[in-house]
C-alpha cells in the first residue's frame, strides 16, 4: 500500500511540476525583478518538460448534494447560514449587488438580527459568480433568524430611500471597494484577477453600476435574492435545544463533541 501511494504521487508530480504549468507572481518594484529572473532561470532549468503533447484541463464530475445539516454543540449561541446561487437560474450579476450588501448589513439585517435578535453579528454577500449567503454568528436564535433571512426579498421589494440615504449606501459601498491596500494585498488582488480572468473593464463596469444604483434597481434585485433562497440550502451550529426546535429545517442533525 505504501509503495503504491508513493508510485501514484510520483506519477502525479511528473504531470504537475513541469515547465509548461509554471506560473510566477511577483509584487515588487523594478529592483525586485532582476533577482527573480536570475533565480527563476535556475528553477526552470531543473523542471522537466511535460510528457503530454497538450496540457489538458481536468474535467470535474463532482455532484454536490444538499446537506442541510444541523450541528449540536454544548454552547448556548448559534451560527446560522443560508446560501444559494442565482447565476445557475440565468440571473446576471450586477454591481448593485454590492450596494445590497451595504443596505442589508447596515439596515434590515442589522436591525432584525443584531438589534432585535441579539446576535453578535450578521453578514451577507452576493458575488459575481452568482453565489449568495446570509450568515449570523453568536446568535441567540436559529429558526427566528432563518425567518428574517426568508423575508429579505419582501424587504427589498418595498425598499425606498431618499437621495441622501441612497448616496450614503453608495458611499459606504465605494469605501469598501477603495480600501487602501498593502503591496502584498495589491499583488494578491492582481494575481486573483489574472487567475480568474477578471479584466479592468469588468471591474470598471461593476464600479459604474455601484455608482448608478437607485431604489428601483434595489427593488428589482429582490428576485435575485429570492432565487438564492429558493435553493433552500441551510447549515447551522447551535445548542441542542435550538437545533431540535428547528429540526424540520435539516436533512441531518449531528452532535459536535
Spans of model-derived segments:
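M16 family metallopeptidases and their MPP-like homologs
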Residues: 1, 19-28, 79-100, 108-215, ...
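Aromatic-residue-lined binding/catalytic grooves and analogous aromatic/hydrophobic interfacial grooves
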Residues: 2-6, 12
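His/Glu-based metal-binding/catalytic segments typifying zinc-dependent metallopeptidases
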Residues: 14, 21-33, 37-115, 256-257
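Short amphipathic alpha-helices in soluble, non-transmembrane regions
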Residues: 36-44, 148-152, 249-250
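C-terminal structured domain segments
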Residues: 41, 49-53, 203-206, 220, ...
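A positional "C-terminalness" feature that preferentially activates on distal terminal regions of long
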Residues: 245-246
Amino acid at each position: 500500500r505504501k509503495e503504491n501511494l508513493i508510485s501514484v504521487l510520483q506519477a502525479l508530480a511528473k504531470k504537475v511540476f513541469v515547465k509548461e504549468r509554471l506560473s510566477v507572481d511577483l509584487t515588487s518594484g523594478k529592483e525586485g525583478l532582476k533577482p527573480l529572473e536570475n533565480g527563476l532561470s535556475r528553477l526552470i532549468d531543473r523542471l522537466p518538460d511535460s510528457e503530454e503533447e497538450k496540457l489538458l484541463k481536468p474535467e470535474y464530475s463532482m455532484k454536490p448534494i444538499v446537506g442541510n445539516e444541523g450541528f449540536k454543540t454544548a454552547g448556548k449561541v448559534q451560527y446560522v447560514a443560508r446560501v444559494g446561487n442565482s447565476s445557475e437560474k440565468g440571473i446576471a450579476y450586477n454591481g448593485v449587488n454590492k450596494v445590497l450588501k451595504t443596505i442589508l448589513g447596515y439596515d434590515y439585517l442589522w436591525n432584525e438580527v443584531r438589534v432585535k435578535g441579539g446576535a453578535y453579528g450578521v453578514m451577507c454577500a452576493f458575488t459575481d459568480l452568482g453565489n449568495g449567503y446570509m450568515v449570523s454568528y453568536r446568535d441567540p436564535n436559529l429558526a427566528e433568524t432563518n425567518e428574517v433571512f426568508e423575508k429579505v426579498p419582501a424587504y427589498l421589494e418595498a425598499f425606498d430611500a431618499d437621495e441622501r440615504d441612497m448616496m450614503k449606501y453608495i458611499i459606504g459601498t465605494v469605501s469598501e471597494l477603495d480600501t487602501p491596500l498593502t503591496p502584498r494585498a495589491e499583488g494578491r488582488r492582481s494575481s486573483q484577477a489574472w487567475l480568474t480572468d477578471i479584466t479592468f473593464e469588468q471591474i470598471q463596469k461593476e464600479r459604474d453600476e455601484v455608482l448608478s444604483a437607485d431604489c428601483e434597481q434595489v427593488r428589482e434585485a429582490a428576485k435575485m435574492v429570492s432565487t438564492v433562497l429558493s435553493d433552500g440550502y441551510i447549515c447551522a451550529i447551535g445548542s441542542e435545544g435550538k437545533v431540535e426546535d428547528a429540526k424540520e429545517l435539516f436533512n441531518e442533525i449531528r452532535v459536535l463533541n
